[in-house]
């Protein structure tokens, strides 16, 4: 009989950091006794990530990403610790029968303790706020900052007293809802001799880190409390804001304030700079996150993509000052390169930020201002015009900027949109030259079509302006045909044969309507659905032979290529599909169909 181990430490030793890193396609180089690699968590040109096989950890000396194999997976895939542990076990091929199953339900004990103490501190500071009667407490938030008590409670705002030196450690030692009890050393500053310290109290000076400040809790993407930002409420503190000390579980630059509270199915997301900007927009019914600075990194972008599957538009709403507006362009560039549709708030007031606008003009003006926005091309034209550049230079810059996005390069309908908008916004009279400029930046796209489709004459130049309408119409028609072909998703049909609930539920998402409209070459979708219904009426369990038995020879011959694609996915997925995965797959397919329907609709409007 196998003795099953209960030791989490022993299990973690089996998760080899080199196996994890190589699984993600990162090449490890050997230099002397060192293992180095290009760090996948930032734009690394020279190997800056060091790997220790003996300690089973990695460390990037450029971006400070560090940890064991689980930490690597968490950061790379934006997963919680427990899910990352399960994935690490799969990657390393660890046999679960040798380990007690309860290990897989645990979270990192050190991380869990960190969350628990931060949660206790949230409660402590909230209680302080409710009890404080001087102007620096609730009166400051309600009277001076005009926050209602519902908002204060929603964001778990608290207060650090002016005399926390005396009360903090003693009060937290007595905190009843945590086991084991909090030790003062856990609140002390981090040091080599006190590596568990969270930095709330300086043992040497006997001073609390936060005093006479509004305490704003910060959470990770999963909603776990990981730190605080403290807003000064007097003139004693030299810094307006002070943050919790950086920690392996708290990297402020990799988080987005308010992220965890938002609806996963939102369509529009505002990005602002500060906490009070989030409070203001939330009060006006807009969903917003704060950068807590001016930068946006790959970790944050991955989190947005992974969490908000229905997101259609990111609205950049940074402060109306030089630093905020100077940061907008670089953020647009990064978001554009990551395939986001971006809009930019066009400030029409002289107030510095959303909070200042709200305090002076109220919620109604906040709502009006939030809806004054430029699309990407409008912003770029305005941005480059302010630099007093020549019209042709502006055109080249805009086209070069946009075509860095691979999605745009492949989106033929956007070519038409680009030409029309630039002609309008730049009051461009020389359409011929503009069109040639677009073609120059779209060489890869041009090569896909013959001269007849592009109406290019034998000299290699685009036809004159009067022919532009014909040319663009041909491009749009081609774009529509190709988009229709791209709508082909064999996995949807495969899963409709694996679990009959997909056939029923996806009908509600207009499965018939979408695919009938596409008229795929060599594949009769309507007949497939009809055959799938017959198949399920005759079979209790999924099997490919059962499906083929309801098909006639003509259908098999005429749809051979498409059916082979479906069959391959069917056979691959059937062995690992579980009935309780149904809702997750269904949501994915419904979202996909919704997006594809919208794409077809947009293309039709252009025709």
Curated annotation (Swiss-Prot):
Cofactor info, note text: Binds 1 zinc ion per monomer. Binds two Mg(2+) per subunit.
Reactions the enzyme catalyzes: ssDNA + n NTP = ssDNA/pppN(pN)n-1 hybrid + (n-1) diphosphate
Zinc finger annotations (CHC2-type) as residue ranges: 39-63
GO terms, biological process: DNA replication, synthesis of primer
Cofactor list: Zn(2+); Mg(2+)
Origin: domain of life: Bacteria
Disulfide bonds: none
Enzyme superclass (EC): transferase
Gene Ontology MF term list: DNA binding; DNA-directed RNA polymerase activity; zinc ion binding
Domain Toprim: 267-350
InterPro entries given in the database record: DNA_primase_core_N_sf, DNA_primase_DnaG, DNA_primase_Znf_CHC2, DnaG_bac, DNAG_N, DnaG_primase, TOPRIM_DnaG_bac, TOPRIM_dom
EC number of this enzyme: 2.7.7.101
Keywords: DNA replication, DNA-binding, DNA-directed RNA polymerase, Magnesium, Metal-binding, Nucleotidyltransferase, Primosome, Transcription, Transferase, Zinc, Zinc-finger
Function: RNA polymerase that catalyzes the synthesis of short RNA molecules used as primers for DNA polymerase during DNA replication.
Subunit structure: Monomer. Interacts with DnaB.
Stated family: Belongs to the DnaG primase family.
Free-text comment about domains: Contains an N-terminal zinc-binding domain, a central core domain that contains the primase activity, and a C-terminal DnaB-binding domain.
Name assigned to this protein: DNA primase
Organism of derivation: Mycoplasma genitalium (strain ATCC 33530 / DSM 19775 / NCTC 10195 / G37)
């Amino acid at each position: 009989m196998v003795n099953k181990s209960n030791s989490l430490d022993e299990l973690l030793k089996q998760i080899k950091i080199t196996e994890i890193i190589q699984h993600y396609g990162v090449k490890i180089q050997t230099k002397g006794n060192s293992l180095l690699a290009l760090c996948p968590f930032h734009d690394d040109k020279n190997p800056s990530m060091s790997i220790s096989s003996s300690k089973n950890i990695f460390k990037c000396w450029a971006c400070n990403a560090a940890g064991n194999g689980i930490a690597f997976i968490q950061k790379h895939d934006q997963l919680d610790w427990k899910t990352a542990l399960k994935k690490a076990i799969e990657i390393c091929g660890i046999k679960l029968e040798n380990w007690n199953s309860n290990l897989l339900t645990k979270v990192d004990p050190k991380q869990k303790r960190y969350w628990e103490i931060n949660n206790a501190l949230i409660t402590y500071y909230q209680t302080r706020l409710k009890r404080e009667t001087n102007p620096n407490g609730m009166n400051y938030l309600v009277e001076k900052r005009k926050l209602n008590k519902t908002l204060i409670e929603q964001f778990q705002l608290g207060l650090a007293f002016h005399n926390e030196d005396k009360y903090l450690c003693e009060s937290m030692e007595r905190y009843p809802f945590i086991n084991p009890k909090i030790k003062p050393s856990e609140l002390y500053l981090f040091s080599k001799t006190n590596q568990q310290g969270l930095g709330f109290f300086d043992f040497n000076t006997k001073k609390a880190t936060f005093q006479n400040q509004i305490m704003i809790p910060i959470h990770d993407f999963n909603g776990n409390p990981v730190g605080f930002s403290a807003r000064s409420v007097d003139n004693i503190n030299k810094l307006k804001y002070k943050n919790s000390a950086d920690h392996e579980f708290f990297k402020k630059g990799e988080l987005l304030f308010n992220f965890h509270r938002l609806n996963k199915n939102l369509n529009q997301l505002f990005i602002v700079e500060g906490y009070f900007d989030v409070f203001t927009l939330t009060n006006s019914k807009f969903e917003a996150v704060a950068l807590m600075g001016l930068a946006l990194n790959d970790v944050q972008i991955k989190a947005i993509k992974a969490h908000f599957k229905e997101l259609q538009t990111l609205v950049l709403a940074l402060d109306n000052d030089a630093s905020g507006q100077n940061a907008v362009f670089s953020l647009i560039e990064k978001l554009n390169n990551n395939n986001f549709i971006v809009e930019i708030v066009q400030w029409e007031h002289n107030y510095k930020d959303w909070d200042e606008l709200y305090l002076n003009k109220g919620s109604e003006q906040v709502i009006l201002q939030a809806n004054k926005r430029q699309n990407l091309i409008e912003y770029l034209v305005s941005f480059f015009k302010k630099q007093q550049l020549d019209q042709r230079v502006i055109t080249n810059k805009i086209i070069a900027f946009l075509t860095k996005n691979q999605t745009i390069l492949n989106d033929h309908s956007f070519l038409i949109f680009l030409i029309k908008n630039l002609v309008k916004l730049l009051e461009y009279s020389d359409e011929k030259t503009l069109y040639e400029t677009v073609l120059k930046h779209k060489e890869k796209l041009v090569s896909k079509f013959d001269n007849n489709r592009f109406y290019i004459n034998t000299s290699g130049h685009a036809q004159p302006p009067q022919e532009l309408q014909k040319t663009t119409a041909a491009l749009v028609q081609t774009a529509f045909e190709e988009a229709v072909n791209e709508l082909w998703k064999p996995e949807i049909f495969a899963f409709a044969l694996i679990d009959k609930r997909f056939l029923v539920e996806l009908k509600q998402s207009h499965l018939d309507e979408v695919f009938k409209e596409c008229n795929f070459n060599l594949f009769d979708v309507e007949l497939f659905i009809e055959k799938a219904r017959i198949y399920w009426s005759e079979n209790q369990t999924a099997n490919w032979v059962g499906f083929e038995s309801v098909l006639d020879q003509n259908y098999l011959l005429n749809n051979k290529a498409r059916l082979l694609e479906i069959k391959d996915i069917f056979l691959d997925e059937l062995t690992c599909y579980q009935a309780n995965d149904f809702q997750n797959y269904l949501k994915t397919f419904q979202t996909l169909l919704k997006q594809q329907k919208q794409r077809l609709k947009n293309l039709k409007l252009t025709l």
